[in-house]
């Protein structure tokens, strides 16, 4: 039996929407990374771009476990003295999208295909998003934070 290799014409990019309210950051990131890579499809191949578009809403209501609120997210501009350190509590208040983008980026493979797949991730702080016309399918994450109960 021959191995099936998906052709670019066979690949479709579906739209999914995930509500991040009271969902733990790691579980949300795993689900988003798997959808972005297309691992939910039977035609998945690690070298082919079979991923989906993922919309994450309510990024400002995400749950962080442990002492992550005190930890810092580091980024560097590449210039001397360009190190930025922002605490998760500060980012959750000002730019909650950056927390999710950073977590999902870390769960994608480190290659050129991941850059393309990451462009299909759309993160919004509130419930409003401009992608209603794409009719995204709702993707449920069963486990929510224990702190929300």
Swiss-Prot record:
Superkingdom, taxonomy of origin: Bacteria
Gene3D superfamilies reported in the protein's UniProt record: Ribosomal protein L13
GO BP, sorted A to Z: negative regulation of translation; translation
A Pfam entry, by short name: Ribosomal_L13
Keywords of the record: Ribonucleoprotein, Ribosomal protein
CDD domains registered for this protein in UniProt: Ribosomal_L13
SUPFAM superfamilies: Ribosomal protein L13
UniProt subunit comment: Part of the 50S ribosomal subunit.
NCBIfam families registered for this protein in UniProt: rplM_bact
Role of this protein: This protein is one of the early assembly proteins of the 50S ribosomal subunit, although it is not seen to bind rRNA by itself. It is important during the early stages of 50S assembly.
HAMAP family reported for this sequence: Ribosomal_uL13 (MF_01366)
Protein name (record): Large ribosomal subunit protein uL13
Organism: Bifidobacterium animalis subsp. lactis (strain AD011)
The organism's taxonomic lineage, starting at the top: Bacteria, Bacillati, Actinomycetota, Actinomycetes, Bifidobacteriales
Gene: rplM
């Amino acid at each position: 039996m021959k191995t099936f290799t998906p052709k670019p014409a066979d690949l479709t990019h579906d739209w999914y929407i995930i509500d991040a309210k009271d969902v733990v950051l790691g579980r949300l990131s795993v689900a988003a990374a798997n959808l972005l890579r297309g691992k939910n499809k039977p035609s998945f191949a690690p070298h082919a771009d079979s991923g989906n578009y993922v919309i994450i809403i309510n990024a400002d209501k995400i749950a962080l476990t442990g002492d992550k609120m005190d930890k810092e997210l580091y980024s560097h501009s590449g210039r001397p003295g360009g190190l930025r350190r922002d605490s998760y509590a500060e980012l959750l208040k000002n730019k909650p999208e950056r927390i999710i983008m950073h977590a999902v980026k870390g769960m994608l493979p480190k290659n050129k295909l991941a850059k393309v797949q990451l462009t299909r991730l759309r993160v919004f702080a509130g419930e409003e998003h401009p992608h209603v016309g794409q009719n995204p399918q709702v993707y449920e994450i069963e486990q929510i934070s224990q702190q929300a109960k």
